[in-house]
């Protein structure tokens, strides 16, 4: 049987991968957005694991709010990536400071 500790270890590994991806890759904006989403999903997994362990639905309801914010963040982030690519022809983070208007 898979216990609470297994879910928490998996969540910690996913969180660590997301943070490591942010620190390792600082140039590609799309990879940075994917790492942020990985971090949010790791946090959601921990909320679900604790919610199931404590038999309380508050954690699962909170996950829906986090998913809503993550979807909005992804949509805005991808819109910025598309605008950056159309204007500059690349999706490097260094090109963000040159966007004006």
From Swiss-Prot:
One of its GO terms (biological process) is ATP synthesis coupled electron transport. Its EC number is 7.1.1.-. Keywords: Cell inner membrane, Cell membrane, Membrane, NAD, Quinone, Translocase, Transmembrane, Transmembrane helix, Transport, Ubiquinone. Pfam families: Oxidored_q2. It is an enzyme of class 7 (translocase). It comes from the Bacteria. GO terms for cellular component: NADH dehydrogenase complex; plasma membrane. Its main location: membrane. It is found in: Cell inner membrane. InterPro entries: NADH_UbQ_OxRdtase_chain4L/K, NUOK/Mnh_C1-like. The chain crosses the membrane at residues 4-24, 30-50, 61-81. It catalyses: a quinone + NADH + 5 H(+)(in) = a quinol + NAD(+) + 4 H(+)(out). Belongs to the complex I subunit 4L family. NCBIfam families: PRK05715.1-2, PRK05715.1-3, PRK05715.1-5. NDH-1 is composed of 14 different subunits. Subunits NuoA, H, J, K, L, M, N constitute the membrane sector of the complex. NDH-1 shuttles electrons from NADH, via FMN and iron-sulfur (Fe-S) centers, to quinones in the respiratory chain. The immediate electron acceptor for the enzyme in this species is believed to be ubiquinone. Couples the redox reaction to proton translocation (for every two electrons transferred, four hydrogen ions are translocated across the cytoplasmic membrane), and thus conserves the redox energy in a proton gradient. This is NADH-quinone oxidoreductase subunit K. It comes from Alkalilimnicola ehrlichii (strain ATCC BAA-1101 / DSM 17681 / MLHE-1). The gene is nuoK.
